[in-house]
Amino acid sequence: CFKRHSQYSVIKIDVGLEKSKNVFSLKRQSSPELYEENIPYDIGTSLQREVKSETLFITSCGNISGAALAILEKIKDNTKISIMYIIPQKDDLFGDKKLQNNLLFNVFQEYSRSAAIERVFLIDNQKVSDAAGPVPVLKYWAALNEMICATYHMINVFEHSSPVLTTMTSRINTARISTIGLMDPKKNEEKMFFSL
């Protein structure tokens, strides 16, 4: 979704990706801890050069999420970072995945409270699914990802546009844990992507 918009520079980090500019393919590891320990040096140096102000989209559903903290540690001092942390559905969280989710969930909040990062946006996949309504099974994940992307993009559009009329006040510096959502004007109903 973000590649459709020229204002975003998309950097992908995952296993099994074809290496190219802004794409980093990591070797498959058996645990989140091994991903954290085995981050290639070139990822950190490259990201320090490339990334100035970014939002990192992270989910804990795979072991590769263990790389998130190591990558963040390498770039956080030189970069204004916000994190969009996507929490898997509760049915998918058990064993090590649940522990990894709890670790990232708490560490990202602590980083935002201490101003090590600009902000953390918490997104619950179940809440996004509820907001999306019925979706064909084969397009389920694509629909959820598109909804998150489109919502985040429109917030960026509004934040970088001059309002004709506003009732909003400036965000206070200590408000660093957030979520996003949708408003249904017909029902006058907010559909938040996480319950804060």
Give short role names for the model-derived ranges.
Residues 1-196:
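Tubulin/FtsZ superfamily GTPase core signature
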